[in-house]
Each structure stands twice: as structure tokens, then as C-alpha cells.
UniProtKB/Swiss-Prot annotation:
This is tRNA pseudouridine synthase A. Formation of pseudouridine at positions 38, 39 and 40 in the anticodon stem and loop of transfer RNAs. Keywords: Isomerase, tRNA processing. GO terms for molecular function: RNA binding; tRNA pseudouridine(38-40) synthase activity. GO terms for biological process: tRNA pseudouridine synthesis. CDD domains: PseudoU_synth_EcTruA. Belongs to the tRNA pseudouridine synthase TruA family. Its EC number is 5.4.99.12. Homodimer. The active site is at 53 (nucleophile). It comes from the Bacteria. It catalyses: uridine(38/39/40) in tRNA = pseudouridine(38/39/40) in tRNA.
Length: 255
């Protein structure tokens, strides 16, 4: 058997999230069931860079699992994609894992997320399920200014889910940019790792600034409070995409 690294994309709608659960279909189940077709029916255990929630999408998720030695990268990609039909999950790249110790989760040095807000009166037709529809005009520059107070290493208790299982609320936020692209407000976040719901809670809080309901400085005050009730609501999963995962030793060849 050989350990393979996989770069995946998926439409998070219709899934209970990445992780297997009893109450519905997960992305993990789709991938591992497809892989079992290549392993004589044995279901391999996968490891993933980020356990996305229900409704959250991915354009650059990274997973690893063991498959038979006889397969090459092209065969791994094509076979898994064939067996994952008709589900909205696809292997974009497959490559041998850099080493036996390499882990999609623990070897990652950075994760990048993008959140899209459709900021117009009319509801989305083509992008429904992929954006958060906000009718009230948003002040993107004010949102960006407020976001900068969250950069650096902080206790992000105010921005993590009450169900978060991380041992520590300390995280280092490397990037949180907000910009307008026509009718879309784009929020881009980067860090080595994030707490559960951290990105969605930051977006929900910044929306209050964009609507003028919060002044810019209140975001820093919410952070300092170390209290979930001091920050804004959790943004819906629809607009969130795991864009990329970075590694010191990247398993995927770059052209």
C-alpha cells in the first residue's frame, strides 16, 4: 500500500460536512467508499486538512489515505472520481505523500478561506448556496479597517463556537482582508489553523460594521472581551470556501 495525498473540491450542499456522521452523508464517506472499490472492499481511513461544516465548500481541501501500490497518480485521480459519481466531490490532483510522517492536518503551515457576500436587493439565482445574500448596503472599507484589529496572535474565545473542542483559544491570524468586487463583498482569511466557526463568526461580526450597526472599534472590544456573546452572529455556511492549504513540502507538483 502507498500513502497518497489528494487535493479535492466539493460542493458542500447536501453534505453534513466533511466528517462521517450518523445523520447524513459526509464528504469523508463519499471519498472512503470510493477508495474501498480500489482496496478490495476494505474501507481506508482518511486524514484531512480541515473538517469543514455542513454547507461549507472546498476548492483546495487536502486529504490522505492509503491505496494499492499498483496505481499511479492519474489512475488514483480518475478511479476515485469515477467511483464518487454522482456526488459533487472531485479529486483535482493526486500525488504520493512526501513522507510516512506527512499529515494533511498536522504538516499544514497555512489555510486560506474565502467568504462571499452578495450585496444587492435581488436574491441570487445562479449563486444560491454559494453566497450570503445581504440586502442592506455594506461599507467594505469600514469592514476591512475593523478586520485589521483581529490580525496577530490573540485569544479568539469571542469568535469560536461554544462546541469548539480545541485545547486553546489562541490563534495567529495572518490575513483578514475585505474588499468589494461589484455586487460581491469578498472576505479572505489566512492562518495556520482556525477555531471552529472562527471565520464565520468573524464575518458575521464584520457585517454589523458594514451595515453601520457597529462602529469600527467595537470589533477590537469584542475580541478583548473573550466572550462569545460579545461578538456578532455566525454567518451562514453558504458563502464559505476552503481555498487552499499550504505546506513546507508541497506534495503536489506545480507547473
Amino acid at each position: 500500500m502507498r500513502r497518497w495525498a489528494l487535493r479535492l473540491e466539493y460542493d458542500g450542499r447536501g453534505f453534513v460536512g466533511w466528517q462521517r456522521q450518523e445523520n447524513g452523508l459526509s464528504v469523508q464517506e463519499v471519498l472512503e467508499t470510493a477508495a474501498s472499490r480500489l482496496c478490495g472492499g476494505d474501507v481506508p481511513d482518511s486524514v484531512v486538512a480541515g473538517r469543514t461544516d455542513a454547507g461549507v465548500h472546498a476548492a483546495g481541501q487536502v486529504a490522505a489515505l492509503e491505496l494499492p501500490d499498483r496505481l499511479d497518480a492519474r489512475a488514483v485521480r480518475e478511479a476515485l472520481n469515477f467511483h464518487m459519481k454522482p456526488h459533487a466531490v472531485a479529486v483535482i490532483e493526486a500525488a504520493p505523500a512526501p513522507s510516512a510522517a506527512w499529515s494533511p492536518r498536522f504538516s499544514a503551515i497555512g489555510r486560506a478561506y474565502r467568504y462571499l457576500i452578495l450585496n444587492r436587493s435581488a436574491r441570487p439565482a445562479l449563486r444560491d448556496g454559494f453566497v450570503w445574500h445581504v440586502k442592506a448596503p455594506l461599507d467594505a472599507p469600514a469592514m476591512h479597517e475593523a478586520a485589521q484589529s483581529l490580525l496577530g496572535r490573540h485569544d479568539f474565545t469571542s469568535f469560536r463556537a461554544s462546541s469548539c473542542q480545541a485545547n486553546s483559544p489562541l490563534r495567529t491570524l495572518d490575513r483578514l482582508d475585505v474588499r468589494r468586487d461589484g455586487e460581491t463583498v469578498v472576505i479572505e482569511a489566512e492562518a495556520r489553523s482556525f477555531l471552529h466557526h472562527q471565520v464565520r463568526n468573524m464575518v458575521g461580526t464584520l457585517k454589523l460594521v458594514g451595515e453601520g450597526r457597529w462602529r469600527v472599534g467595537r470589533v477590537a472590544e469584542a475580541l478583548a472581551a473573550r466572550d462569545r456573546s460579545a461578538a456578532g452572529p455566525t454567518a451562514p455556511p453558504d458563502g464559505l470556501v476552503l481555498v487552499a492549504v499550504r505546506y513546507e513540502v508541497d506534495p503536489f507538483p506545480r507547473n
